[in-house]
Amino acid sequence: MHAFLQQLPALIGVVIGALGSYVAIVRGDQARFRRERAARWEERRLEVYAEYARTLKKSVTLTYRVASHLGNDPHPHPLNLTEAEPLLAEATVGRDPSGEALILLGSPEVVEQARAWVTAVMEMERFMRTETHDPVAWRELMDRQRAGREGYYAAVRDDLALPPGHSGRWLTVPE
C-alpha cells in the first residue's frame, strides 16, 4: 500500500492531464465546428443575396428596354411592351422564390434594403406599363432604383463583413 501512495500523485497528474487534454480537444472541435458552420452560412447567404440581385436586375433591364422603346431611356436595345410582357412575367416569377430565400436567410437590414429596391423596381414597372413618354419622371425612377440597389449592396457588404465596393454608377452616355 505504501508503494501505491507514493505513486498516487503521479497517477493523479496523469488523470488530470488526460482530462485537460480531452477538454482542450473537445473545445477545439466545438470552436472549429462553429467556425465552419458560420462559414457555410455566410457562403449560403452570399449566394442568396447575389441570386436576388440577379433576378431583380432582369426586371430592371427589361424596364430599361421598354422605356427605351417609349423614348424615356437611352438603352441600345428597345423592346415594345407587348414583347416584354412574357419576359417580365418570367422575371417576376423568378424573383419571388429568390425573395423568399432572402427573407429566410437574410439579415433584417438586408431584407429591408431589398424591399426598398424591389419597391422602386415595381414603380418603374407600373410607369412603364402606362406607356408614358416622360424622360424626367423616368430619370427620377431610375435614380430611386439605383439608390435602392446601392442600399441593398451596402447592407449585404455590412452583413457579410465585406469591404466597401463600387457604387455601380458609371457614365455610359455622355451628358
Where are these regions (language model features)?
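Feature marks short, highly hydrophobic, charge-poor N-terminal signal-anchor/signal peptide-like helices
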Residues: M1-G13
